[in-house]
Curated annotation (Swiss-Prot):
HAMAP family: NRAMP. The chain crosses the membrane at residues 56-73, 83-102, 140-160, 165-184, 194-214, 238-256, 285-304, 347-366, 398-415, 427-447, 464-485, 494-513. Belongs to the NRAMP family. Residues 1-55, 103-139, 185-193, 257-284, 367-397, 448-463, 514-548 are cytoplasmic. The gene is SLC11A1. It is found in: Late endosome membrane; Lysosome membrane. Glycans are attached at residues 321, 335. This is Natural resistance-associated macrophage protein 1. It comes from Bison bison (American bison). One of its GO terms (cellular component) is phagocytic vesicle membrane. One of its GO terms (biological process) is manganese ion transport. Its main location: membrane.
Amino acid sequence: MSGDTGPPKQGGTRYGSISSPPSPEPQQAPPGGTYLSEKIPIPDTESGTFSLRKLWAFTGPGFLMSIAFLDPGNIESDLQAGAVAGFKLLWVLLWATVLGLLCQRLAARLGVVTGKDLGEVCHLYYPKVPRILLWLTIELAIVGSDMQEVIGTAIAFSLLSAGRIPLWGGVLITIVDAFFFLFLDNYGLRKLEAFFGFLITIMALTFGYEYVVAQPAQGALLQGLFLPSCPGCGQPELLQAVGIIGAIIMPHNIYLHSSLVKSREVDRSRRADIREANMYFLIEATIALSVSFLINLFVMAVFGQAFYKQTNQAAFNICANSSLQDYAPIFPRNNLTVAVDIYQGGVILGCLFGPAALYIWAVGLLAAGQSSTMTGTYAGQFVMEGFLKLRWSRFARVLLTRSCAILPTVLLAVFRDLRDLSGLNDLLNVLQSLLLPFAVLPILTFTSMPALMREFANGLVSKVITSSIMVLVCAVNLYFVISYVPSLPHPAYFSLVALLAAAYLGLTTYLVWTCLITQGATLLAHSSHQRFLYGLPEEDQEKGRTSG
C-alpha cells in the first residue's frame, strides 16, 4: 500500500504511510477462508446523493457488530440494573450506547481508510512485547464473552425444557450449536447477515412482548432516560453502572467491526468513495445500535417495573399463587431484596404474566446467546490473524475459544448452583469494562494519525470526546478495583491482585504514551516510536503493503 510520506527522513530513516492503495483491488482472503472471502460490490449511483440502494449494499457489518450489544451479558446487566435501581440507570444505558457508537465509528473508519483491521495495524506499529500482551487481553475478552453466551444458552435450554435439560447439559449442547453456525457460513455472506438480522428481530419481538405485558410507568421511564441523576444511589448502583458500560462497550467488538467493513468493495484510491463509505457505515451502525438500545431498554424497563425493591418473600408468594408454583422454591423465604439473574428473571415474568412470558423470555435469551456465537468466532479469527499472522480455519478457532469457555462453565454447572453461574456472568461484565482500554486506546491512537489516516484522521472534537470516554472508563475501573480489593477472602489474594494490577498499569501506561504522541505530544516520540508521528519506517512499509 502506498501513500504520502511525512518528513522525508528522521534520524536517517524514511517514514511513510500504509494507507490508501493506488488500486481498488480487494485483499484476498487467506487460504483458510474468513468472512472476507466474499466481497459485496457497491452499486454506482449519482455522486453526492443519498441512495437507499447503496445503504442496502453497506448494510450488514453494523448489525453483526450490534449483536455484541445484545448478548446474554447485556441481558443480565439490563435486568439487574432494573432490579437494583429501577429506571434510574436508563440514562447510563443511553449514553453508554452513544459512546459505543462513537467507538465503533472509529473502528469502521480505520478499516475503510486503510483497508486493514485494528489487529493488523497493531501488528505493524506496536513492538513485540506490548503487541503480544495486547493480543492476550483481547483473547481474554473474547473467551469471557463466549462464556456469557454459553451461560445464557444453557439457562435458555433449562427454561424451555422446564428443567428437564440440566445446566451442564445445556452447556454441552453449546458445543454442537457453535459448529452448526459454521455450516451457515457456507451459504454466502448476505445470507449469513440476513440470518443474524432474523435473530435480532426475534429478540426485538420477544423482549418487546415482555415490555408490553409489563406496562412500565412511562413517565418515570422517560425521567430515568433523559435526566442523568441517581437519587439515593450507593455502591451497588454504581457497580451496576460499571457493569452496563462493560456489557455495552466490548473490547473485541471494536476489533471485529474494523474487519467486517472490509467485506465491501471500496475504491480506496478515491477520496470521495472513502468518504461515502464512512457515511453509509455510520448510518447503518446508528440504525443497528438504535435497535439494540431499544431491546436493552425493553429488558431494563420490564425489570425496573416488576422487580425493583421486590423481596424474596414477595417473589415466592407471587410464584406460589401462580400456575408456575413449582418454581417458587428458587426464591428464599426472607425479606431480603431479590438478587435477580437471567434464570429467576424468566421465572418471575412467567409467574406475573403467565407461562407464555417465561417461554418467550427463554426464546429471546436463546436468540441472544446464539447470535453472539458466530460473531465471537469471527472476532477471534480476525484478532489472531491480525496480531500474530496465524491463519486458522474457523473450525479450529471455534474449538479453541469454546473449549476455553466451556471448561470453567461446565465445572460450575456441575459442582455449584445456578447462582454461581449467574454470578460469573456479572464478573465477566466487569472484566469487559476492565479490558476496554486495550481497545479504545489503540483505536484512538491510530485514527488520530495523519500519516495513516490522511485527511480522515480524527479532528479536535473527535479527539476530545474519545479521550473523555477513555478517562471516564479508567476512572470507573479504578473505583471498582479500590472497592473490590477489601472484599478479597484471603490476604494471599492481595499478591496476585498486585501482580495483575502492575501488568495492567504497565500496558495501559504504554498505550497512553503512544496515544499521547498522536495527540500532539511530539516530545514523547523517541526512536522507533517516531512511526506514530510519521508512519512506518521505509523497511517496514513493504510489510504493511502486503500484510492482511
